[in-house]
């Protein structure tokens, strides 16, 4: 037998319509101002965005939004969102989407608490502080909803690096299996 250590401080809220309670969960952690990060406009067309946003409003949480995260998230999108979070005075980042959105959220959360360039973290500068991170995961993938890692691509330098830090664990991850029901079986299983 090999000795090991295991730590996972992320709270998982699993079940149908759990995303409609995100405001309650965020309120429990003291969130007041959130940057919502997401990928495509499909989350608005499906009603998912409004379900989550309504919950935030019901719990007095102000928010701004930043959409357009792509697969293999980029530092340019992260920098854009960091500037928005700082200007807004965000205390939290809420990801609605898959692993790329959540990786972006983690980098944004760290960058919003840092005076330098967020890419510094991917070059070795340790994360000292981060905004609170929350997520509604819409695609099972790499386990980003329960880990401390973020992978970001620098499109200028053609580099793709990761960071790992205890400040980057999400506080609460919502998993509603219904949100993943339309994903192909092969994608979900493999």
What are these regions (language model features)?
Residues 1-92:
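ATP/NTP phosphate-donor binding region
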Residues 11, 33-35, 63-64, 91-94, ...:
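Structural motif
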Residues 20, 113-190:
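A glycine/threonine-rich phosphate-anchoring loop and its flanking beta-alpha core
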Residues 44-45, 73, 104, 144, ...:
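Secondary-structure boundary/capping motif
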Residues 51-52, 82, 101-115, 146-147:
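Short Gly/Thr/Asp-enriched flexible loops that form oxyanion-binding sites at enzyme active sites
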Residues 89-108, 138-144:
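Glycine/serine-rich anion-binding loops at beta->alpha junctions
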């Amino acid at each position: 037998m090999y000795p090991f250590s295991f730590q996972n401080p992320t709270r998982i809220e699993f079940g149908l319509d759990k995303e409609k309670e995100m405001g309650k969960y965020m309120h429990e952690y003291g969130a007041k101002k959130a940057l919502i990060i997401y990928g495509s406009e499909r989350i608005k067309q499906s009603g998912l965005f409004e379900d989550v946003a309504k919950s935030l409003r019901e719990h007095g949480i102000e928010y701004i939004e930043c959409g357009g995260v792509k697969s293999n998230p980029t530092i340019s999108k992260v920098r854009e969102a960091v500037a928005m979070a700082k200007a807004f005075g965000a205390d939290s980042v809420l990801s609605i989407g898959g692993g790329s959105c959540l990786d972006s959220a983690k980098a944004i959360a760290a960058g919003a608490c840092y005076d330098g360039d967020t890419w510094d973290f991917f070059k070795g500068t340790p994360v000292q502080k981060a905004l609170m991170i929350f997520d509604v995961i819409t695609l099972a993938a790499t386990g980003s909803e329960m880990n401390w890692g973020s992978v970001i691509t620098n499109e200028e330098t053609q580099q793709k690096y990761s960071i790992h830090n205890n400040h980057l664990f999400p506080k609460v991850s919502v998993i509603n299996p219904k949100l993943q029901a339309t994903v192909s079986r092969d994608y979900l299983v493999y």
